[in-house]
């Protein structure tokens, strides 16, 4: 488990991180979301030791992170960091060799990884000849080629088309399934919602919310409930303690002034006919994000 506790960082009089605390669990995909300037990149750079914090600790499996630990990390910065005139395969092999891989093993793993990321036909092309989306895939390969035990990725889905997004999702999911803590930032909240197990929301250098998707929906989700019947739901308007927000035939959205009133709706729905679905109105990550950063 990767854990940050009480991380502070200031530049002069400007405090950019204020008590940042969260965990990235083993085998879990953790989405790190926030607006521009919220503190995501600074936090990631502190995790990697690129920047030092003014206060707080970063630990891995309960112990302070060492230089040896960080060599087992896979880090992808938001900025392009590849050599533009170098061939794609040669470059990824080079990154594997920097991590101590022997030449043959580095070439084999780099080739397999690039093929899986959809760059199998571009191995001998220079980086500068690739589209921005393919450059992003190559940059992801550079972060993964040494088979890291922890992943920290800053905007890995930026510039990717939907097919490439699915490809990268599959690769990252496999890393998490193998037990690696995976932390990634993204402005694409739909991707974060679909992919991650846990969410961390940061604004103004402070963590505004963190937890699993279900935990965040429970804490910050809608207070409305949805009912869908194979029949008319007009009777719902007469239920005590119920305010109907929306209604269309057998579909209704309502709020209840108590848990008992809500349960009474379910009992009445069963008595009136075939219940297709009943539950809390689904709240999107975008809606939760807007609420907690307000």
Predicted feature residues:
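A generic structural signal for secondary-structure junctions
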Residues: 61, 91, 100, 218-221, ...
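ABC transporter nucleotide-binding domain
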Residues: 169-256
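ABC transporter nucleotide-binding domains
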Residues: 9-203, 209
């Amino acid at each position: 488990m990767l854990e940050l506790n009480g991380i502070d960082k200031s530049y002069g009089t400007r405090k950019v991180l204020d008590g940042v605390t969260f965990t990235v669990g083993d085998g879990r995909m953790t989405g790190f979301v926030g607006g521009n300037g919220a503190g995501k990149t600074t936090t990631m750079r502190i995790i990697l030791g690129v920047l030092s914090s003014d206060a707080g600790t970063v630990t891995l499996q309960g112990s302070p992170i060492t230089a040896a630990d960080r060599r087992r990390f896979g880090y992808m910065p938001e900025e392009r960091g590849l050599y533009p005139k170098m061939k794609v395969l040669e470059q990824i092999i080079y990154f594997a060799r920097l991590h101590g891989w022997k030449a043959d093993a580095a070439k084999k793993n780099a080739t397999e990884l690039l093929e899986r990321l959809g760059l199998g036909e571009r191995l001998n092309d220079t980086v500068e000849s690739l589209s921005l989306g393919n450059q992003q895939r190559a940059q992801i390969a550079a972060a993964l080629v040494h088979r890291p035990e922890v992943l920290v990725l800053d905007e890995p889905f930026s510039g990717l088309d939907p097919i490439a997004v699915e490809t990268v999702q599959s690769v990252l999911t496999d890393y998490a399934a193998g037990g690696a803590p995976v932390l990634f930032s993204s402005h694409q909240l739909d991707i974060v919602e679909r992919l991650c197990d846990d969410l961390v929301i940061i604004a103004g250098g402070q963590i505004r919310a963190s937890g699993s998707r279900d935990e965040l929906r429970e804490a910050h989700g809608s207070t409305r409930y949805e009912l869908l019947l194979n029949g008319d739901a007009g009777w719902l308007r007469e239920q005590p303690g119920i305010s109907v927000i929306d209604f269309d035939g057998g579909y209704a959205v309502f709020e209840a002034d108590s848990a008992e009133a809500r349960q009474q709706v379910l009992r009445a729905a069963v008595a009136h006919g075939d219940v297709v679905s009943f539950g809390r109105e689904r709240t999107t990550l975008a809606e939760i994000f807007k609420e907690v950063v307000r």
